[in-house]
Amino acid sequence: MKSMAALPLAALAVVLAAPAYAQSDSRGDGDDYHSQDPIVITAPYVRSLDILGNVTVVEGDELARDRRGQIGDTLTRQAGVSATSFSPGSSRPVLRGFQGDRIRVLNDGIGAIDASNISVDHGVTIDPLTVERVEILRGPAVLLFGSQAIGGAVNLFDNRIARSVPQDHPHFDAIAGYGSAAEDRSAGASLDIALTPKLVAHVDGSWRKSGDLRVGGFTLAPLLQLDVLEAAAEELEEGNNEEADALLEAAVERGRVRNTGNDSWTAAGGLSFIDEGGQLGIALSYYDSNYGVPTRPGAHHHHEEGEGEAGGEEEEEAPVTIGLKQWRVDVRGEVELGSGFFDKLRIRGGFADYEHIEFEGDEVGTLFTNKGIEARTELTQADRGGWRGATGLQYMSRDFDAVGAEAFVPPTLTEQMAIFTLQEWTLGALGLEAAARYEATRVKANTLGISRSFDAFSAALGARYDFGDRSSFGVSFSRAARAPSAEELFSDGPHIATQAFEVGDPDFSSERSWGAEATLKLRGDAFSVALTGYANWFDGFIFADDTGLEEDELPVFVYRQRNARLWGFEAEASARIAQFGGFNLNADAIADLTRAKIKGGDHVPRIPPLRLLGGLELQGARLDVRAEVEWTDDQKRVAAFETPTEGFTMVNASVAWRPLADKNRVTLLLSANNIFDVNARRHASFTKDFVPLAGRDIRVTARVSF
């Protein structure tokens, strides 16, 4: 398996040894330094109106308004996006019902190299405060970034490795905000300086601190309230008055979720060389976060026999917290190759040293470490009569270890080597696209003496027909494969943070799926509409099944492999409905729905229900005013032992004011979320029954750029 690393690392070495030059920035003085042509996650050379990659871009004031402590909660206003929302300190995106190891969170095209895909209680090590642009990709083109993106990808862009030289003066960005629901205070800033006409230095940092989350209504969902009240009655009958009182207090608690505070900070620096023939840059970053892990009332932490007992009385459970940190090095470069068949060589690489500790009070429970590397090389083709594309190699390695009484996964080494290509042909109004990826994966559990190897081939084919000036209809078909993760293969033990006993299966085969997708995009001078329908048929779909059994007073979740079917739709529309006094009055709406069933009739757990969101926005040169209503349906299509979730209606409003006329350099935002303080729960969340969404949240944000 060592040879798997040789090819991409050799290519990386060639590029690092080559002279790195890049085109100097030739934009005028009035141009915004950060304004760039749209970047499409599939590759920068592919049209934004493509078939295989359904891309949503979030940036600017929209990103500033929606920023939360984790990227999952930041993106939930986008079509087809929900979040795991385990706690304010840990929330990952859910795309089309997919989460975990089927969604990749990327940092400029390569993985976050953390442990957030392993378990829902692990936070993403990218602070949204440092992110300038987010691209959400659904559809088969995401497979170019690995089989772990079989459900989609979220690509986060910062400017730690500069793409252009700031003109005339250093470039400074800053953002600061306050949110009332958790007394959330945050600030971030970045600075780019041209040390020479070809050398750019970058520094950035961020800080965030929040308290316990305030919520509308009862903390516990009705069914869990009943369970806790029954448990309190049993404790009272047995004479355990203190335990009964604690359970009664938890059952009737309103207004907040205990142990959900978060304290995090980041620091980073980068250096980039930019000239006419290419560019090369390197960045070093550090991420540190400490956050509370809310626990289900009545759930007991796992202890070794006799531990936590004295004189026959059970010791009071201490709060669980996670201390997380990551050091990371990133490299990005490209070389112009001239006018041959390939016109550009791109490289992207990263190494990270990650660890987090799960504490029970002041005592160390379990230590998780993850040392990982990911590298990509891409050769892009020059446009030849409407044909263009790219071909590349990717290597990934993850050395994961867990030490402690509740290490539910043994030490594992995962290595993956892949080759991929994406090709596009434009024939007048007709466009064709094809993508393919082959990857070899090995997962080795050293202490168990088990090593599994998987070969996965994925391919997609799509066609698009353009009609009118800006409208199109596209269809695509795909075949995808995903190797099981180490956690799905080898889990066997109690997991303190999720309060579950997790059991994997080392005999799993690769997960395979066939997919079909159709997209209609209509755009006029005053309106736009995008409709997407999709379906996937899985052979060997892997999921965590709640067995209804208990081990060490914890519910047992067993990973199983079954055939499954998933389908759904996403719809987006916007229109200008009036113009007056220098303002445009616009209306917009989104709708999304996913259905997923296991063969034999069971529903896939944690699938978001139907959602509708509509808004009215008054937009002017200096002032924007917005009001919106989000309606989420009940979710009664649940798996065995999974509880249903009540729907909710939430009203939000915001105002953005730009006091200076010069290029929106200063923006002040005031937003009121969940104005009527409703009790709302996200069905995709593992903790939904005891961690509601934030109640009324008044947020103030200031954003400066010059």
Which positions does each model-derived feature cover?
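Short, acidic, small-residue-rich periplasmic hinge/interaction motif at the N-terminus
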Residues: 23-64, 72, 100
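Gram-negative outer-membrane beta-barrel transporters
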Residues: 26-27, 389, 528-538, 555-636
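N-terminal periplasmic accessory domains that precede
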Residues: 62, 69-74, 91-94, 106, ...
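Short acidic/polar hinge/loop motifs at secondary-structure boundaries
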Residues: 111-140
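Transmembrane beta-barrel wall of Gram-negative outer-membrane proteins
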Residues: 180-209, 220-294, 323-338, 342, ...
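Flexible loop and strand-edge segments within Gram-negative outer membrane beta-barrel domains
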Residues: 258-264, 277-344, 351-374, 405-407, ...
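Outer membrane beta-barrel strand-and-loop segments of large Gram-negative receptors
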Residues: 372-379, 418, 505-509, 515, ...
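C-terminal beta-signal and adjacent terminal beta-strands/loops
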Residues: 481, 539, 636, 657-706
